[in-house]
Amino acid sequence: VLGEKNYTRYAQEYGVWRNTFVEDDMVKYSSMNVRPEFAIKEEYLYPLIADKYDTSCILTGYFWQDLWAAKKIIAEGVKEHFDIGSRVDGFIAHLLAAGIKVNVIDIRPFPTKVEGLTTILDDATMLSQFEDDSISSISALCSLEHFGLGRYGDPVDPESCFQCMAQIQKKMKKGGRLYISVPIGQNRVEFNAHRVFYADTIISIFDQLNLVEYSVTDNGDIEYNADIHKYDSYDKGRVIGLFLFEK
């Protein structure tokens, strides 16, 4: 909740790191250090206590979803792609590295100039800047489930994500492809974090599109071409459904 920087300040102020391995390591470091400019000083302490016993590399669902979608888009030979709310430091970066022009649809301009990345200022629930049947490649990876819950400062609106889904398929051209991911399980809202959907609910919402592939990420792994109903009542972790649709 606090974030790493703020938690570190909290840990230092309240001595959370004291009587832990950090204190022992400080003593050892100080006894061995021969460079005065690199001596430990109280004002520069930045104690991190979680990393020592953390797994060196955990492949999260976000890693797999970003890789899954990017590989498919690159393989399709797409030159220009549109996106709603996906991770810039993962999925979008993959596409940019492959030389694909990416148009991010957002109500706010992107704060930094990045080669190949353009912001289209638009409300994703309306997509008023786009003609019907005009988009050939579009994605929304783990973003639509957050719409209308107020978590990111957006207006509270229970229908917001469903309006966006309706507009996406309306704006897609014949032969166009949609890459979408959402949490999978029993239909529900876990306010104000996100919504969870049956896989079949997503398929029924995008009734103007054909499902090409449904895969899932689960606890650091990916399962390709999963059964639609396999995770309807799954409660052993967070499952992300990966949907590829074509119009």
Language model region names:
Residues 127-138:
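A short acidic, Gly/Pro-enriched loop at the edge of an enzyme's catalytic core
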Residues 152-157, 229-231:
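Short glycine-enriched, charge-decorated loop/helix-capping segments at active-site entrances
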Residues 155-177:
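A short glycine-rich, Lys/Arg-flanked "PGG" loop and its adjoining helix->strand segment in the class I
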Residues 1-80, 94, 190-208, 212-222, ...:
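N-terminal accessory regions of S-adenosyl-L-methionine
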Residues 139, 144, 148:
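A conserved beta-strand element that flanks and buttresses the S-adenosyl-L-methionine
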Residues 150-152, 177-203:
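Conserved class I S-adenosyl-L-methionine
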Residues 75, 80-127:
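Class I SAM-dependent methyltransferase SAM/SAH-binding core
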